[in-house]
Regions:
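Alpha-helical cap/lid subdomain in secreted, periplasmic
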Residues: 3, 74-86, 95-277, 281-301
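Serine-esterase "nucleophile elbow" of acetyl-processing enzymes
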Residues: 1-91, 101-116
């Protein structure tokens, strides 16, 4: 049996990179789940671009984390392995789809058989119009004027004094954000036409590299938390489906299956936007079923 390494690449924002210090995400969970069913080793690599001036003595512009399969035998792979499967999580919080183009040289070198693109959530969530128009009222502090500065916190600290402060500040921010959205119709960070234009260009670049490309749809959010976003997400998903078909990629609406895994509040953090650990596991299960209906087909059966 010939040995062949396999690479899967995942592009996206914080919903793919993960939340918190451990950055648990559906990619991490997918690696864990595949390991239980695979004869080959399954590794997870997480990379993100960083500012070069973070390090004073050495010139770095990429930071990462390696989650190597602990079941390796004599550093040569699991018994019966026909090649390792590496999952490359290249997502980064706070970065729009424009940042994905910087990874194309690495993707070319990796020659992945699969690229999963989870884009559009960061760009499409409805936020106060003042963010794009730069017309903030005087009473909004400067530190609250960032694109996500007033978004609901995903969670609070376990320490009561920190939790009390965080909860208090978050309550003021949510009151202010919802007031702004009520006073003036909110806007997404990026217009849907611009998003789809970038998506189309990205898909063209990925397809010429010979990879199977899967676009996953946006996940539902609470209209109470983000007024106007659920309806806008439906429109964005329809456009994502169209561009996927036009560019020869696949569109996978995993949100429909996620609803069968549990209640929304049990699968997402309190912001209703980021999947929690349970949500990440559920998404990984859904993705695994869709991507690997026959694990033997990827040499890991």
């Amino acid at each position: 049996m010939s040995w062949k390494a396999r690479n899967w690449v995942f592009l996206g924002d914080s919903l793919t990179e993960g939340v918190g210090s451990t950055r648990v995400s559906h990619v991490t969970e997918l690696a864990r789940q595949l390991r239980t069913k695979s004869n080959g080793a399954v590794h997870e690599f997480r990379l993100r671009r960083i500012e070069a001036n973070v390090f004073r003595q050495i010139d770095f512009n990429v930071a990462g984390f390696m989650n190597i399969d602990g079941e390796l035998v004599n550093a040569g792979g699991k018994q019966g392995s026909c090649g390792d499967l590496s999952l490359w999580n290249l997502a980064c919080e706070g970065q729009t789809i424009v940042s994905d183009f910087a990874w194309l040289p690495l993707i070319t070198a990796l020659k992945p058989e699969l690229v999963v693109v989870f884009r559009g959530a960061l760009e499409s969530i409805i936020r106060p119009a003042a963010l794009r128009e730069h017309t903030w009222p005087w009473w909004v502090p400067a530190s609250w004027r960032g694109y996500a500065a007033m978004d609901p916190r995903c969670y609070f600290s376990d320490r009561w004094w920190r939790k009390a402060k965080q909860a208090g500040v978050d309550a003021f921010k949510q009151k202010a954000r919802l007031k702004l959205l009520k006073q003036c119709k909110g806007q997404p960070l990026m217009d849907v036409d611009q998003l789809i234009s970038h998506e189309s260009s990205l898909l063209k670049s990925l397809r010429v590299r010979g990879a199977r490309v899967v676009i996953v749809g946006l996940l539902p959010v609470s209209d109470d938390r983000f007024p106007g976003s659920p309806e806008h997400f439906k429109n964005v998903n329809a456009r994502l489906r169209d561009v996927a078909e036009r560019e020869g990629a696949e569109f996978f609406d995993w949100a429909a299956q996620l609803a069968q895994k549990g209640r929304h509040e049990d699968l997402f953090y309190r912001d209703s936007f980021h999947p929690n650990a349970a949500g990440a596991r559920a998404l990984a299960e859904i993705l695994q079923t869709h991507l690997c209906r026959d694990l033997a087909a990827i040499g890991h059966g």
